[in-house]
Amino acid sequence: MAVGSTPKKPKQKRRSSDHRKHHNHDDDAATMASPAPPRSRGYGAYLRRCFSPPSALVVLCLFLLCVIWKRIPISRLPPPPRFYSFDVVNEFPHDPNAFTQGLLYGGNDTLFESTGLYSRSSLREVQVYHQMDGSLFGEGLTLLGERLFQVTWLENTGFIYDRYNFNKREKFTHQMHDGWGLATDGKVLFGSDGSSTLYQIDPLTLKVIKRVTVRYNDHEVPFLNELEYVNGEVWANIWQTDCIARISQEDGLVISWILLHGLRQGLLRSGHTAIDVLNGIAWDKEKNRLFVTGKLWPKLYEIKLRPVRGPSNGRIENLCPIRA
């Protein structure tokens, strides 16, 4: 090649072509590293990848759980038990010789009381007194209309009295194993016999129409004693304790506990050492007043409940031995 002549271009073209090939190779590699969005004809495969068997199974399980949860009858789940202590509103004198077995509010600041012990059992009102047969041991008492219903201990015998003059209207035989407590909602009678069974009794035929077993934390609650009906619940003294169980009349579950240990302890500290256990609940539904007393207690108390987190000195089973 002569001096000063220009270089041939084919060689440059070859170099440029090699450069383009190298550049295109890099682009292809980049394209392969980032998958292209699925084409319209490839959506089936794309969906199959998104909804693979494990993913579909998870979605199906979540759906079934939602369906099952919606079908659970939430109303049947028992509410968590609550606990109540008390404040004393008023104190009233009470016959210290009255072995209280039944107590109820009769309106117009009148209380009716049934007392026990052989030869000392009675049915009484303030300034009114009816001596019972000495062979009978008076127990639970309730008022329905103008009739006072009373049951007796170790007998399947009960009596119906006129509320105004205590004249005995009728003697009846009941179907409970024993006579301990009575209450009413104005339609049926509720009865207890010292077991864990809460009875419903027809006030006309005096036949048992329903039984439920009272339970707390999957355990039966025995020794149901004096009863009272309060705002849709049946309240029961638990024999030999200072506890009141608030019971659902429908299924027998204990809704909450009322802890009244302080009342008896206060009487003991005051020197009243002859007293027996708490027994006697009366509810004034017109004024929302609650009265309680005990066997051989010299005082009757009007109290107001206040909720507490739980028993202050141990489990409820330690304060209210509810297991037989």
Residue ranges and their predicted role:
Residues 1-48:
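Short, low-complexity, Lys/Arg-enriched N-terminal segments of secretory-pathway carbohydrate enzymes
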Residues 54, 87-123, 129-142, 180-181, ...:
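Beta-strand-rich domains and repeat architectures in extracellular enzymes and scaffolds
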Residues 62-87, 109-125:
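Blade/loop signatures of beta-propeller domains
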Residues 108-118, 145-156, 189-195, 234-240, ...:
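Conserved beta-strand positions in repeat-built beta-propeller and related beta-rich domains
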Residues 126-179:
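Blade-loop segments of beta-propeller domains
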Residues 162-166, 202-206, 248-252, 304-308:
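Short loop/turn segments that connect beta-strands within beta-propeller blades
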